[in-house]
Swiss-Prot record:
Organism encoding this protein: Arabidopsis thaliana
Gene assigned in the entry: SGR1
Function: Magnesium chelatase involved in chlorophyll a degradation in the chlorophyll-protein complexes of photosystem I (PSI) and photosystem II (PSII). Contributes to the degradation of PSI and PSII in the thylakoid membranes. Required to trigger chlorophyll degradation during natural and dark-induced leaf senescence. Mediates chlorophyll degradation during embryo degreening. Recombinant SGR1 possesses high dechelating activity against chlorophyll a, very low activity against chlorophyllide a, and no activity against chlorophyll b.
Catalytic activity: chlorophyll a + 2 H(+) = pheophytin a + Mg(2+)
Pfam families the record matches: Staygreen (PF12638)
Family: Belongs to the staygreen family.
Name of the featured protein: Magnesium dechelatase SGR1, chloroplastic
Keywords (A to Z) from UniProt: Chlorophyll catabolism, Chloroplast, Lyase, Membrane, Plastid, Thylakoid, Transit peptide
Tissue: Expressed in roots, leaves, seeds, flowers, buds, petals, sepals and siliques.
Length: 268
């Protein structure tokens, strides 16, 4: 989620990148802190705003795209996914709400290098709704591997902001079906480092949006083995879970797509 350029150029002494007196319109998104200053003399250091401070969601910086989904359709009957990306040029977030991952948001060398997108999908498992969120920590190239611990820290810190973006962007759905606020949030951290390759339950959605929410390292309930009406969708719209075999890496096994590891239940 954090821009790799910001990770690589952290100053030895962190300085506040924001003044409390600055207006919201001039502040950059707290989700990504690779901010650009107008004066050239200040561009020698990449500012890292609120690196260890509170993460704040700013709705004015969120652009929402509805792509082929009906706001009135419950996600237990129609696939519903979220693709959240950030622009270093505009400092704004883009949230696509669609039936499958919006791959067009993930194109370009910067996106492939930073891997700071967050994707999620609604699932119904044995009659219970849940939101499954996926983050890429490391794998794919050595720079991501080098900063795996730092990336994990940033993702954990900023995920409440991401979830608030989901709630705000898909507000009509949640207003129509308030019971979805009680749906459990499962966060999948994909990494080739065993320590960070895990699944965590962040509790119900209303709690997960809080930075003080309770987190437990555990596994979600598996869908029914046979065809049924209590589980939906039958196939995940997140491609990270079923592609190339990756048995040879310590700590995880099973599948991998473009360097993304799938947490191994037997290792958790």
């Amino acid at each position: 989620m954090c821009s790799l350029s910001a990770i690589m150029l952290l100053p030895t002494k962190l300085k506040p990148a924001y003044s409390d007196k600055r207006s919201n319109s001039s502040s950059s998104s707290s989700l990504f802190f690779n901010n650009r200053r107008s004066k050239k003399k200040n561009q020698s250091i990449v500012p890292v705003a609120r690196l260890f401070g509170p993460a704040i969601f700013e709705s004015s910086k969120l652009k929402v795209l509805f792509l082929g989904v009906d706001e009135k359709k419950h996600p237990s009957t129609l696939p519903r996914t979220y693709t959240l990306t950030h622009s270093d040029i505009t400092a704004k977030l883009t949230l696509a709400i669609s039936q499958s991952i919006n791959n067009s948001q993930l194109q370009g060398w910067a996106n492939r290098l930073y891997r700071d997108e967050v994707v999620a999908e609604w699932k119904k498992v044995k009659g219970k709704m849940s939101l499954h969120v996926h983050c890429h920590i490391s794998g794919g190239h050595f720079l991501l591997d080098l900063f795996a611990k730092f990336r994990y820290f940033i993702f954990c810190k900023e995920l409440p902001v991401v979830l608030k973006a989901f709630v705000h962007g898909d507000g009509n759905l949640l207003n129509n079906y308030p019971e979805l606020q009680e749906a459990l949030v499962w966060v999948y951290f994909h990494s080739n480092v065993n320590e960070f390759n895990k699944v965590e339950c962040w509790g119900p959605l209303w709690e997960a949006v809080s930075p003080d929410g309770h987190k437990t390292e555990t596994l979600p309930e598996a869908r029914c083995a046979d065809e049924c009406s209590c589980c939906f969708p039958t196939v995940s719209s997140i491609p990270w879970s079923h592609s190339l075999s990756n048995e040879g890496v310590n700590g995880y096994s099973g599948t991998q797509t473009e360097g993304i590891a799938t947490p191994n239940p037997e290792k958790l």
